[in-house]
């Protein structure tokens, strides 16, 4: 699949070579540029084929053809798309956004090499004769439902990943947690946002479990830095920042919406547990449930977490894109029982 990218040379790029601006302005690799160089009209300046050593001037129009290499094509085992239909939220020639159901992995791992969301996307691409690698931008845990974004080419993937790391691309989640938040916590009403800054590390007693280190209280932890602290016995910690808003409270459970400044493994699950409000259905972080409240809590057979919204800039035209994933049945049933709506 070919992708043509055009951009205007900015003043600070004047005097540089075509290759340099392709690498710095577009983030292209040397291999991508080399492949384009040997195509007919693969690289053009102001509509005329040019060399990568040519010098550019302000306002020059540079166009390059990005063609998928053979080893860049989809290599995953494909699900039959008819048997496993995708719920597509948005699609164009550069990106695909889908609503992931709970119960499947985002991409192959361990014994799951052919039954993941990425395999479903592979089958969808195959059916549409779209020949490109499956590139998820971030992932969701197996039991988490909601929006997953895929890039259809390497440049889109690079730019979306850069947005994710800088915070331009961000998601908003809905979760149902155990317990009622104290009056002090929600004193500013349900419209207030609260922040958790506990760093996270792997536990020593379980290969999958993470834990929050609460020695730091609510003090700020630089979101870009992994650091070493004597408080953790010189164990490497991962900074983690979660913002949450309380939407509904009952004596035994609450509904919250959350946004992340960092994207650590199990971050929402670990931070909510550290606050004393583990997610309903999360058997990894809450083995037992209070007997006196079981009858009052909704029944969830998976972790009660849904990636609800996403906002980002289109990787090529820079337009803002905002998407929302419809709630799954278990969330809808819970909300209907209490006459709650978002």
Descriptions of predicted regions:
Residues 1-342:
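RNA pseudouridine synthases
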